[in-house]
Amino acid sequence: MKITPLGDNVVIKKLLATA
C-alpha cells in the first residue's frame, strides 16, 4: 500500500467521522 498525503487525509477523515 502506498502512503500518500491525500490517501492519509481520507483515512483520517473516515476515522474521525466514525469516531
From Swiss-Prot:
Record has Methyltransferase as a keyword: no
GO cellular component, as recorded: cytoplasm
Cellular localization per UniProt: Cytoplasm
Transmembrane segments: none
Main location: cytoplasm
Record's keyword annotation contains Cytoplasm: yes
Subunit-level organization: Heptamer of 7 subunits arranged in a ring. Interacts with the chaperonin GroEL.
Family listed: Belongs to the GroES chaperonin family.
Role summary: Together with the chaperonin GroEL, plays an essential role in assisting protein folding. The GroEL-GroES system forms a nano-cage that allows encapsulation of the non-native substrate proteins and provides a physical environment optimized to promote and accelerate protein folding. GroES binds to the apical surface of the GroEL ring, thereby capping the opening of the GroEL channel.
Protein name: Co-chaperonin GroES
Species: Clostridium pasteurianum
Encoding gene, per UniProt annotation: groES
